[in-house]
Design a protein with these regions (language model features):
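The feature encodes the CheY-like receiver
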Residues: 14, 55-56, 65, 74, ...
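Charged docking surfaces used in two-component/phosphorelay signaling
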Residues: 15-23
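C-terminal output helix
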Residues: 106-115
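Short hydrophobic/Thr-rich beta-strand motif most characteristic of the beta2 strand and flanking loop
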Residues: 25-32, 40
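Active-site beta3 strand of CheY-like receiver
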Residues: 44-50
């Protein structure tokens, strides 16, 4: 089963991601603390990351850069899912290494298409 790591400090959001990812046949790895994300990722080796941006340190921008510095995650797709709907945040996230940027609230089909598209590229 394909592992997808979700890092979001909002427990309601991670519960929703757990439900929708399992329904699509993925194995979600859920974290509400970004500080643990890199160490857990090295153990679990997810095929894709879904990150929120607005989290306590490290925030999603910094976490994205941290993941890209790790050799095993240089090419792992990262999808940002955030309430920040401004061009500057989008530019910074893509510059930090994100592959896609979805804004909350998002449509489930939008998320599914992004996940499938990025996993097919691997």
């Amino acid at each position: 089963m394909t592992k997808i790591m979700v890092v979001d400090d909002d427990k309601d959001a991670t519960s929703l991601f757990e439900e929708v990812l399992k329904a699509e046949g993925y194995e979600p790895i859920l974290l509400n603390e970004s500080v643990k994300a890199v160490s857990v990722a090295k153990k679990e080796l997810p095929a894709l990351f879904i990150l929120d941006l607005m989290m306590p340190e490290p925030d999603g921008f910094k976490l994205c850069r941290m993941l890209r510095k790790e050799p095993e995650f240089r090419n792992t797709p990262i999808i940002i899912v955030t309430a920040l709907n401004d061009t500057d945040s989008r530019i910074v996230a893509i510059g930090a290494g994100a592959n896609d940027y979805l804004t909350k609230p998002f449509r489930l089909d939008e998320l599914y298409v992004s996940i499938k598209d990025h996993l097919e590229d691997l």
